[in-house]
Amino acid sequence: MKKGVILINLGGPDSLEAVEPFLYNLFSDPDIFSLPFQKVLAKIIAKLRAKKTRHYYELMGGKSPQYEQTLEQAKALQERLGEDYKVVVGMRYWKPYIKDALSELLKEGINEVILLPLYPQYSKTTTGSAFNEFERSKKALKADHIKVKKIEHFYDHPLYIKAWAEQIKQSVEKPEEYHFLFSAHSLPKKLIEEGDPYQEQTEKTVKLIMENFPEVEYTLAYQSKVGFGKWLEPSTDEVIRNLIKKEVKKLLVIPISFVSEHSETLYELDKQYRELAQELGYEEFVRVPTLRTNPYFISALEDLVKNEV
């Protein structure tokens, strides 16, 4: 019997018109923002942020590239796994949704499903939210009969680590000449204090990658803070401002939370932080591409799936 694999990611608007409803879906997720009158507030916040966010996507070509890149990953994984598996894509906050992916598998008579969120490090706000949405989808589709296996993380998988090491080596000829700046998506400190393992797992990922570059100095920083309150520190822009004072001239920026391109990489890192680095006088600002279909990364996904069977 064929098994189903759902590759899950955040999702992104596929047009400028989709920006506001995408933001509404994001801000109405109780696993990220637990607020009173959440849906009403989400509608207001989405409307307030839509114009600025649309501008980001205009600069990126009018849409997020994430769905197409996740499809490429699904195709590459499908080729590795062969005909005993059916690999589909389900997004958390935009089309095709996780429910759409499950529906596609059910139509083929598949009753064993492996969930593979493309978040290397576990957080209740990402992987946890995806799992909760899957359970709601399963109930809505009356699919309680199916067997489900969940892959929670792969932050320390040897092939995932090797993929990043190779990606770095392909980005610059002499990595030892650069200061490595790992930029991870930030989270509210409150979540970490409540036991979310994201920060600890991110630090472990960085440590394992750096075993391949023992002579290189590095910093882990956090980007993309949303709203108020205390978030993980130091922030990426703060680190960029501080390193130049320590006579660092060449930065190699590694988007450690991401396996495909997002607004966080294409706009924040490539535009905002690159411009900041240029203004501050850095000689070089090299941003390592996300893993996408890096062969070692696809091998890591293949291994994760096969070890769950």
Swiss-Prot record:
GO terms for biological process: heme biosynthetic process. Its main location: cytoplasm. Keywords: Cytoplasm, Heme biosynthesis, Iron, Lyase, Metal-binding, Porphyrin biosynthesis. Fe cation binds at H185, E264. It catalyses: heme b + 2 H(+) = protoporphyrin IX + Fe(2+). SUPFAM superfamilies: Chelatase (SSF53800). The lineage of its organism: Bacteria, Pseudomonadati, Aquificota, Aquificia, Aquificales. GO terms for cellular component: cytoplasm. GO terms for molecular function: ferrochelatase activity; metal ion binding. PROSITE patterns: FERROCHELATASE (PS00534). This is Ferrochelatase. Belongs to the ferrochelatase family. It comes from the Bacteria. The keyword Nucleus does not apply. It is an enzyme of class 4 (lyase). It is found in: Cytoplasm. Catalyzes the ferrous insertion into protoporphyrin IX. Its EC number is 4.98.1.1. Pathway: Porphyrin-containing compound metabolism; protoheme biosynthesis; protoheme from protoporphyrin-IX: step 1/1. Signal peptide: none annotated. It holds the Pfam family Ferrochelatase.
